[in-house]
Amino acid sequence: MGQKINPLGFRLGVTQNHHSYWFAQPKNYSKLLQEDQKMRNCIENYVYKNIRNSSNYGGIARIEIKRKTDLIQVEIHTGFPALLVENRKRGIEQLKTDVQSILTSGDRKLRMTLTEVTKPYGEPNILAEYIALQLESRVAFRRTMKKAIELAKKTNIKGIKIQIAGRLNGAEIARVEWAREGRVPLQTLRAKIDYCYYPAQTIYGVLGIKIWIFQDEK
């Protein structure tokens, strides 16, 4: 069977950009890299606990981190920024406090901004969250995939592939099912392909969701 390389790492520097923008001395590099991951985990956990429920989800497309001499700038790209701002009394301020507590260098200021994604269902992370929410609510997987493809097509993408693996609909034996619409040229480097893996926790076990979205060709 053919093994698939991660499409994001494969195209890094060609059509994909880094999500962390900073330079560091070799002795500090690993510490700052771990700090970046802790900040991302903190933001995702906050959204999962305080915002995500059966009727809506956080909708975070990506988190970009930029470091300067005395400033750390965290930019959250989300399809639904109103959820972060309005859902709780303090909202973004509470999230900023939680992230600040993780930082090891207390002398650096933290600036957090929200950027709205104009076409949220064209982002694989947001689409995967939607699918996971449906599967956790016991909606049939074929119906969920069909609806997700319809939502994605409205954003004028050129192609999409969705794959779900696990005990589908509670079956005894795990299997893999997939659906594709349009072109998804994984071997073409100039093709801008976004990719996401997302686990869904169902009563029958974990389902693995993979989404490839072909945005455009450079």
UniProtKB/Swiss-Prot annotation:
Organism domain of life: Eukaryota
Family recorded in the similarity comment: Belongs to the universal ribosomal protein uS3 family.
InterPro entries: KH_dom-like_a/b, KH_dom_type_2, KH_sf_prok-type, Ribosomal_S3_C_sf, Ribosomal_uS3_bac-typ, Ribosomal_uS3_C, Ribosomal_uS3_CS
Domain KH type-2 residues, every copy: 47-118
Main subcellular location of this protein, as a coarse class: plastid
NCBIfam families xrefs: rpsC_bact
The keyword Ribosomal protein is annotated on this UniProt entry: yes
Assembly notes: Part of the 30S ribosomal subunit.
GO molecular function per UniProt: rRNA binding; structural constituent of ribosome
First and last residue of the signal peptide: none
UniProt-annotated location(s): Plastid, Chloroplast
GO biological process terms held by the UniProt record: translation
Mitochondrion listed as a keyword: no
GO cellular component, one term: chloroplast
Underlying gene: rps3
Key words, A-Z: Chloroplast, Plastid, Ribonucleoprotein, Ribosomal protein, RNA-binding, rRNA-binding
Pfam families, sorted: Ribosomal_S3_C
SUPFAM superfamilies on file: Prokaryotic type KH domain (KH-domain type II), Ribosomal protein S3 C-terminal domain
Entry protein name: Small ribosomal subunit protein uS3c
